[in-house]
Amino acid sequence: MRRRYSTSIISLVAAAILFAVTPGVPGSSLPAAAAATDSLPALHIDGSRFVDENGRVVLLHGVNSVNKEPPYFAPETTITAQDAELLSRHGFNTVRLGVNFDGLMPTEGVVDTAYLDRVAAAVDMLAQYGIHTVLDNHQDGLSKIWGGNGFPEWAIHARPAAGEPNPGFPLNYLMPTMNAGWDEVWNNTYGALDYLGQALAALADKMNGHPGALGLELLNEPWPGTAFLSCFPNGCTGFDAKYQAAMQKLTDAVRARNAGLMVLWEPNVTWNETMPSNLGKNPPISAPNIVFAPHDYCIPSQMAIYSGLPTFLRGLCPLQQGKTWGNIDAFTHRTGIPSLVTEFGDGDATVLSNTLINADDRFIGWQYWQYGAGRGADPFLGEIGNQLVRTYPQATSGTPGRMIFDPATGDFAYRYTPRATGKPTEIYVSDLHYPNGYQVRVDGGTVTSAPGARVVTVEANGSTPVSVYINRPGSKGASVPDGPVGTGSASGSASGSASGSGGSGSSSGSGS
């Protein structure tokens, strides 16, 4: 019985971290267009939402750009102005940009200022295209010591034992010596957390005066070390308390150098096996401007892709992903802290759709894994891009309500309760879903943008709810689902067409 349990845990662990090898979307070498903006206002947190300087609620859609190999960021390959133009054209307004402790502090106690300069230049470049950057302190497999990346070798004292098998990523997470290395981190045995705090503080300081820097994610996919078995089957209260203390320590280091920068905390990686997070239970999270950064991966689908298991297992994905989103709901209810899904990805468009529908239901932003550094044609012109490039409200002048988007038809519907901000609601209209143009109808408001504009702007007529409908000419359209945000599937029904409505709230055009 004990051996059977151990084998089950090994399978779960392997599945939980397989997502990190999900095939990425290659970058684009398309020429840059004149899409750059003069400045990008910084965002801040209001309750559980991101808001801009005018008080509009901002929804973030974006991608990851993470280079796991030295030099960890190269301006000519990691992400370029051509990439930024392409992402902006497709409506993405955020990038999760990988940074690496080994790159920040390759020598003990010495920060690489040239590395900071390269990162800051990328943040500024992305900001010129209206893209907010989350800096992701990335790791996979703790350190190069075990064939991974993240912590510099000098920061970890544990070493593989003579004759200890290394099965490679991801099963190397089960190596006793790697778990000993993780224990060093969480116990701060040799000061690894202190040095990481210094490195992240230097990065945060560098971001002063760079409004495109949305926030700093303290550590990607934190592994519990030898405590990992305690996380099954209901989460690990003891480890999460220690982990929360470590996150608070790093947050304090960052805030000492940059008080306004958002700080993103991930749950420990067993989250991806539907284990709930105990962050914020005891003690509560008291630091301001904290963002929860969960990931959403489907274990059955990943096992089908990477372990040769039957593809019908993907049919279980709605159950597993439903549990993950239930855990997000529980965390939000407990803490009131906003969430940003900083990783999700799969070669199966249906699995992606599960994430995107759940995110739309809750008005939660996301960053897809991953937009790679390879060159080629526009990578968003296939089935995956058809899901990711979406019509959605980028800035809402009021309180968001329910919304739906059907990538098969381009039908979009959205309702919000207006509030005076001095700026209009802005809805990005997908540049992929309306080959013959689109139609827009607004109930309770007026379209103020030109026909065919890539961003539809809407002004409320009063204080009553505003409903916006966008669809292809001749489509039956969609209707806004009933109920408040987070109460059901964003699937909608075909009864809210923008066609034939006339009036001051209507507009149509070919798009551009």
Model-derived features with residue positions:
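Short, basic/low-complexity N-terminal boundary segments at the transition from targeting/disordered tails
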Residues: T22-L30, A35-L40, L381-L388
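Beta-strand-rich extracellular modules
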Residues: N471-P473
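N-terminal-biased segments
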Residues: T37-H44, N67-K68, F73, T78-A81, ...
